Amino acid sequence: MANHMLGLGSQFPTFSKTAVVSLEQGKEFATITSEDHKKDGKWLVMFWWPKDFTFVCPTEIAEFNRRAGDFADRDASLIGASTDSEFVHAAWRRDHDDLRGLKFPMLADTSKSLAEELGILTEGEKVAYRVTYIADQDGVIRWVSA
């Protein structure tokens, strides 16, 4: 695990990233920011996976999707993320049955800047570890699972 992974009580980093929010032509992408959940008074649940088009990741993502309503009922914004591009995310969603109807955005951290600030990049390939963060309405990290 990275040496300086952000933990409980740390401020979740500010970010503005492109995400896949739909598979509808012309409406696939949107900018998601760290302020979006705060202005709505919601908690942030952001989970990370290493790479798209792998075998384990879709199962985890599909389970988060199955539970998306539970997160919404608890005033939490759910975001999935990896260091793959928004175009790879969109292709993966189109290609995989379990990912076509996702109810949450797939964030593209192509610059790896957010993963780096969180301290969750692997040393070799520079892809994200499997990690889940929960931050409160003020952006303070309240739970981490790695």
Residue ranges and their predicted role:
Residues 1-146:
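Chalcogenol-based redox active-site neighborhoods
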